[in-house]
């Protein structure tokens, strides 16, 4: 990743929802930001573009859900198709990160924090995105 200062955004793209996380300006800490509806696709893309602009994002990290043996399966293909639609609309670097088991880790974290089940369902995607982003930020140090 470039040494250009600024926030990094992460996306956890699913069929129905997209979790969004954002780093602090120093790129040390990732935090859940929001969850947006993945459909209609045009609305989701507009919302992501607005967030990128509003938070002055300088890089994008996208979780790629590889299969357990590291292959690209149907879910990863869905994510790649989404990024193919997003890429021409933005002028910042995009990084794919292996996101196997991040949703499981997010669920466990929220259970440990005693977050109620209905709140967990509402925030699972953005928490997973923050785990993806924090792993990426840590790997860049």
Curated annotation (Swiss-Prot):
Record localization: Cytoplasm
Transmembrane segment boundaries: none
Keywords: Cytoplasm, Hydrolase, Nuclease, Ribosome biogenesis
Signal peptide: none
EC number: 3.1.-.-
GO annotation (BP), single: rRNA 5'-end processing
Source organism per UniProt: Roseiflexus sp. (strain RS-1)
Lineage: Bacteria, Bacillati, Chloroflexota, Chloroflexia, Chloroflexales
Protein known as: Putative pre-16S rRNA nuclease
Function: Could be a nuclease involved in processing of the 5'-end of pre-16S rRNA.
One Gene Ontology term of the molecular function aspect: nuclease activity
GO cellular component terms, A-Z: cytosol
InterPro entries to which the protein is assigned, alphabetical: RNaseH-like_sf, YqgF, YqgF/RNaseH-like_dom, YqgF/RNaseH-like_dom_sf
Database matches in CDD domains: YqgF (cd16964)
Family affiliation: Belongs to the YqgF nuclease family.
Pfam families xrefs: RuvX
């Amino acid at each position: 990743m470039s040494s250009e200062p600024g926030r990094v955004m992460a996306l956890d793209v699913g069929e129905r929802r997209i979790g969004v996380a954002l780093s602090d300006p120093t790129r040390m800490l990732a935090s859940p930001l929001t969850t947006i509806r993945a459909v209609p696709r045009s609305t989701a893309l507009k919302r992501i573009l607005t967030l990128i602009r509003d938070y002055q994002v300088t890089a994008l990290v996208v979780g790629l859900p590889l299969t357990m043996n590291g292959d690209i399966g149907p879910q990863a293909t869905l994510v790649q198709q989404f990024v193919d639609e997003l890429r021409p609309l933005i002028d910042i670097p995009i990084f794919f990160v292996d996101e196997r088991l991040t949703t499981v880790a997010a669920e466990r974290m929220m259970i440990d924090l005693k977050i109620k089940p209905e709140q967990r369902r509402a925030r699972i995607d953005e928490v997973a995105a923050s785990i993806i982003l924090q792993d990426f930020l840590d790997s860049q140090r």
